[in-house]
């Protein structure tokens, strides 16, 4: 009899979890509280409780070749960075292609998930759900929690003295949908993550004046990177990751700063991150520098005090310390919680949960509950969650045996202590992980990591493409369980799909003898690098 698996949420990770269960002979039942799949990527005009909320203009921050499911590329005619409506269409195509809808119960809220009385023996869970006013209970052999971490807004009003006296409008960025509400208003956006920056830029097209308040600053990069390539196809490669992790942290930090400043000097715009040693995810925005230099967005430091109709900033430089404000948007992030789980199952402290490999509660007697997608890699979340799901089902099936509880708890505690070995980038913030290192570790565990040295002997072109080219998800399907016969072709044609939607006019490309000579030297240097790295 197939093991029954309860899956909470039908977003990108939930859909991947359903597919992984079906592929491995498990029996999944996915509970989705709304009336459709898609999670974060399904736009609605109104905020829905318990669901991530996005604004109308959201576009993916990771390009289509890097943010697809590993055995299901985006359609070739999709833009490289996908608008939310098309991303949702893609998820629906995925669900149709692999017959996932039959495993989803829509309009069903998970009320509670508790251990069965014989949990220490069976590892089973009782799942209580609510559907159209009717409460139901069922027993499952395992549970996969795929609710994400963008549903509970973090709004620390106590950190902003005087906010209760403010006569204007203020709200969390989760409530934002369209820029029309800012027309002819003086707007302050607090927080410089991707959402805060997007909102400030959008508001600047209709508002009277826009201020963006940041305490720690941030690196800002464009989706359009070196030579017009998508940023993550250039930045996220095995070769670059090898170089970054082999150098002392101060050198890596300097190199990263140099690269980030190649678009514009962040110091001249008041944006340089306060802490450059601990890696902070860069902000993706194609317009911000242009809006700042044309006087449409003004960067300000942290808020000192909020008055009835104005805001006072601390340590303002070359500018008034007080500005009249009509609307304040708090883009202050999110907290995460699992209201349907007892704290003894997954305890959240200081923005972290004690999860082995960011998946399994380290203290559970039986590894039958997994949290999928509760991680912040410097890479796409979709293939990360999918790889976590592939790993998880192998644990559920007993193919992978987790280490003793003491070993898992020790690893989790070491991660929480923010220890750093002095080499490579410093991933010391809660939930942060090195994207390539993390996924390679999971792939190794399920025997799905490609052996580049063997490939160098049998298929050298593929090996070199994988090492020096983008770390695209298709690499995760070359071997092991879930192997996809189209993986090699997808890897070798990824640049063709990238340029198909941009090369819409025939142009004459000519190269000088000097350029040809440079390319020859580049090839020779590449071969020497391969020899040194692999031997």
UniProtKB/Swiss-Prot annotation:
It catalyses: hypotaurine + NADPH + O2 + H(+) = taurine + NADP(+) + H2O; hypotaurine + NADH + O2 + H(+) = taurine + NAD(+) + H2O; trimethylamine + NADPH + O2 = trimethylamine N-oxide + NADP(+) + H2O; N,N-dimethylaniline + NADPH + O2 + H(+) = N,N-dimethylaniline N-oxide + NADP(+) + H2O. One of its GO terms (cellular component) is endoplasmic reticulum membrane. The record marks 208 as: Important for substrate binding. Liver. Its EC number is 1.14.13.148, 1.14.13.8. This is Flavin-containing monooxygenase 1. InterPro entries: FAD/NAD-bd_sf, Flavin_mOase, Flavin_mOase-like, Flavin_mOase_1, FMO-like. NADP(+) binds at residues 60-61, 195-198. The chain crosses the membrane at residues 514-534. Keywords: Acetylation, Endoplasmic reticulum, FAD, Flavoprotein, Membrane, Monooxygenase, NADP, Oxidoreductase, Transmembrane, Transmembrane helix. It is an enzyme of class 1 (oxidoreductase). Its cofactor is FAD. The lineage of its organism: Eukaryota, Metazoa, Chordata, Craniata, Vertebrata. Residues 535 are cytoplasmic. It is found in: Endoplasmic reticulum membrane. It comes from the Eukaryota. One of its GO terms (biological process) is taurine biosynthetic process. The keyword Membrane applies. SUPFAM superfamilies: FAD/NAD(P)-binding domain. Belongs to the FMO family. Broad spectrum monooxygenase that catalyzes the oxygenation of a wide variety of nitrogen- and sulfur-containing compounds including xenobiotics. Catalyzes the S-oxygenation of hypotaurine to produce taurine, an organic osmolyte involved in cell volume regulation as well as a variety of cytoprotective and developmental processes. FAD binds at residues 9-13, 32, 40-41, 61-62. One of its GO terms (molecular function) is flavin adenine dinucleotide binding. The keyword Membrane applies. It is a single-pass membrane protein. PANTHER family: DIMETHYLANILINE MONOOXYGENASE. Residues 2-513 are lumenal.
């Amino acid at each position: 009899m197939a093991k029954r698996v309860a899956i909470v949420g039908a977003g990108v990770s939930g859909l991947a979890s359903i597919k992984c269960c079906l592929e491995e002979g498990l029996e999944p039942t996915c509970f989705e509280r709304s009336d459709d799949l898609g999670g974060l990527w399904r736009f609605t005009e109104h905020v829905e409780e318990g669901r991530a909320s996005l604004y109308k203009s959201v576009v993916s921050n990771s390009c289509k070749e890097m943010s697809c499911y590993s055995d299901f590329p985006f359609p070739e005619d999709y833009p490289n960075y996908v608008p939310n409506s098309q991303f949702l269409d893609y998820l629906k195509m995925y669900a149709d292609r692999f017959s996932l809808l039959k495993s989803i119960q829509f309009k069903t809220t998970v009320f509670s998930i508790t251990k069965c009385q014989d949990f220490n023996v069976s590892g089973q869970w009782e799942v209580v759900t609510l559907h159209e006013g009717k409460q139901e209970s069922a027993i499952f052999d395992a549970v996969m929690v795929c609710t994400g971490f963008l549903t509970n807004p973090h709004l620390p009003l106590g950190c902003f003295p005087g906010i209760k006296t403010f006569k204007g409008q203020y709200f969390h960025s989760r409530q934002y949908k369209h820029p029309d509400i800012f027309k002819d208003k003086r707007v302050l956006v607090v927080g410089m993550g991707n959402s805060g920056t997007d909102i400030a830029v959008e508001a600047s097209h209709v508002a009277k004046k826009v201020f963006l308040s940041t305490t720690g600053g941030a690196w800002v990069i464009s989706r359009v990177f070196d030579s017009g390539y998508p940023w993550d196809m250039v930045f996220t490669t095995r070769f670059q990751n090898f170089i970054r992790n082999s150098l002392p942290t101060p050198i890596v930090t300097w190199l990263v700063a140099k690269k980030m400043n190649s678009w514009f000097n962040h110091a001249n715009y008041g944006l340089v991150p306060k802490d450059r040693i601990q890696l902070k995810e860069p902000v993706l925005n194609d317009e911000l520098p242009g809006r700042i230099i044309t006087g449409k967005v003004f960067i300000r430091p942290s808020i000192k005090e909020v008055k009835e109709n104005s805001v006072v900033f601390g340590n303002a430089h070359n500018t008034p310390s007080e500005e009249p404000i009509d609307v304040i948007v708090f883009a202050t992030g999110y907290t995460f919680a699992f209201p349907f789980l007892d704290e003894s199952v997954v305890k959240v402290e200081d923005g972290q949960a004690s999860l082995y490999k960011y998946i399994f509660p380290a203290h559970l007697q039986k590894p039958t509950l997994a949290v999928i997608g509760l991680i912040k890699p410097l890479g796409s979340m979709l293939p990360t969650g999918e790889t976590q799901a592939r790993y998880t089902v192998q644990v559920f099936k007993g193919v992978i045996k987790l280490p003793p509880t003491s070993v898992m708890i020790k690893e989790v505690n070491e991660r929480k202590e923010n220890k750093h070995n002095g080499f490579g980038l410093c991933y010391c913030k809660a939930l942060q992980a090195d994207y390539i290192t993390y996924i390679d570790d999971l792939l190794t565990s399920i025997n799905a990591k490609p052996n580049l040295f063997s490939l160098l002997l049998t298929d050298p072109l593929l090996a070199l493409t994988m090492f020096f080219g983008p770390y695209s998800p298709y690499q995760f399907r070359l071997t092991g369980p879930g192997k996809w016969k189209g993986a090699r072709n997808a890897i070798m044609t990824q640049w063709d799909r990238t340029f198909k939607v941009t090369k819409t006019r025939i142009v004459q490309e000519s190269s000088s003898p000097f350029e040809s000579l440079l390319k020859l030297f580049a090839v020779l240097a590449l071969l020497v690098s391969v020899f040194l790295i692999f031997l």
